Amino acid sequence: MRAVVLVGGFGTRLRPLTATIPKPMLPVGHVPIIERLVTNLGRSGVTDVTLALGFKPEPFVEAFPDGECAGVTLCYAVEPEPLDTAGAIRFAAEFAGIDDTFVVANGDILTDLDVSELVRFHRERGAQATIHLVGVPDPSAFGVVALDAQGRVERFVEKPAPGTAPSNLINAGTYVLEASALQLIPTGQKVSIERATFPLIAAEGGLFALATDDYWIDTGRPELYLQANLDVLGDTRRHDRCVAVHPDAVVDPSAVVEHSIIGARAQVGAAVIRNSVLLHGAVVEAGAVVTDSVVMGRVGANAVVHDSVLGADGVVAPGEHLSGVRRPSPDAATGT
């Protein structure tokens, strides 16, 4: 089985973290998001993945120079200009010569889904396209999918008012497509698979969806990226767990580190770190307290950082108190 993974976005929702690294290359539990995603696809029987690349493709090629990740063969398809989701899928699939049933995955989604079950369901229904769905407590912020008894998609409802949604099932960002679906996507144009292609297929009765209760998270917002990291510390994930402190990190013996991840080459003085992620090279000086935050930059001595995101150039002065802040500001950062 072959797959296309969409990794060409700008990562604007995760700025300033994505000012220096593409979103799918950010680590979750010391391992890049894209590597965790490809590993799960490989567990499900996917043997070849084409990365649909856009802005700044170089970090992906440099990370996997031999064209292999977790035993899965990689192909790099760099779109000449932003083509949105459907446009990128067609470009990448044709670049890779895909001419049979294939899988598509959004590059910022982490899930324990067994994709082979989605493929089996797709083939049993004779579908042209199949969407993986997950249930959420409040679907009003999402596009909701209404199904018939066989799993055929009847309609989409975008961001329904509270209490009016036909279901609590939302698009979870993994699909199975027939190669024939590519012909519904205009070449060389910006086309959304969610807003343009799927409604076309649904109108002909060829769009199906399967809901599962597998672990699933969209890592595209800071609070969810933080949660994805903390999830691999416990028993939330079926397969993926990690050690809290990377062996290449330097942590003062008197530091208090609770339910947090300390990345490679991070330095922590006699500080307190709770429910937080310190990424590669982050520095937290003695006396500082960091809670519910993601840190790439430097936190000065005796500073307090809560519910904040510090990019690579983010600096908190000694003694400064920070809460609910992104530094540098997202507007000042150039996303990838």
Language-model segment annotations:
Residues 1-19:
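N-terminal nucleotide-binding beta1-loop-alpha1 segment
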Residues 14, 60-64, 228:
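Hydrophobic packing residues within well-ordered alpha-helices of enzyme cores
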Residues 25, 144-147, 198, 209:
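A structural signal for short hydrophobic beta-strand segments in well-ordered beta-sheet cores
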Residues 101-103, 110, 116-123, 136-139, ...:
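Catalytic-core segments of class I nucleotidyltransferases/pyrophosphorylases
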Residues 125-135:
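A short, conserved acidic/glycine-rich loop-to-beta-strand motif
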Residues 239-336:
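Structural signal for interior beta-strand "rungs" in well-ordered beta-sheet cores
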